[in-house]
């Protein structure tokens, strides 16, 4: 019996590392952001972040915004758009606890037919077990 336990202990380091229960990965954060953006759900996008830097039309990019102000500006930003597609194009952890997600957005402004493209860069920080949005930048 003790030999079986010993062999089981030897095999443990060979197992792949899995996130602990309740811990999210940067890929999970990217998927949640994609769903929130597609649904124009600003609250879900901001999540539990307390401050977010927004570099989008209609927002002053010089300072972080509180959660409620960021949500309101994102709602205004989403309002005139009708989504046509949103793809995650990159997910990178640039250093431990700091990562970014790049999304390509296709949309039309309500009442028009011109398809527009935009790249969104989302910056994340790992706080505890969750990746939290700290920055959202838009580039045409």
Where are these regions (language model features)?
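Short, low-complexity N-terminal intrinsically disordered segments enriched in polar/charged residues
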Residues: 2-4, 9-12, 18-39, 47, ...
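Short beta-strand edge/turn micro-motifs at domain boundaries
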Residues: 114-140
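A short gly/proline-enriched turn/hairpin at secondary-structure junctions
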Residues: 54-64
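Surface-exposed, charged secondary-structure patches
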Residues: 69-112
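A short, structured loop/turn motif at beta-sheet edges
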Residues: 40, 91-98, 124-130
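Solvent-exposed loop/turn segments at secondary-structure junctions
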Residues: 61, 107-109, 139-140
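Residue-level signal for cytosolic alpha-helical hairpin/rod architecture
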Residues: 27-31, 56, 85
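Short, well-ordered alpha-helical segments enriched in acidic and aromatic residues
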Residues: 41-53
């Amino acid at each position: 019996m003790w030999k079986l336990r010993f062999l089981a202990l030897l095999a443990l380091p060979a197992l792949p590392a899995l996130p602990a229960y309740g811990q999210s990965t940067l890929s999970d954060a990217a998927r949640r952001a994609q769903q929130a953006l597609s649904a124009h759900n600003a609250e879900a996008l901001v999540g539990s972040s307390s401050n977010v830097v927004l570099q989008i039309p209609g927002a002053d990019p010089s300072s972080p915004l509180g959660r409620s102000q960021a949500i309101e500006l994102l709602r205004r930003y989403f309002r005139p758009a009708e989504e046509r597609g949103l793809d995650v194009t990159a997910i990178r952890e640039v250093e431990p606890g700091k990562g970014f997600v790049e999304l390509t957005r296709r949309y039309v402004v309500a009442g028009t037919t011109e398809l527009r493209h935009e790249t969104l860069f989302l910056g994340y920080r790992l706080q505890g077990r969750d990746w939290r949005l700290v920055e959202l930048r838009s580039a045409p």
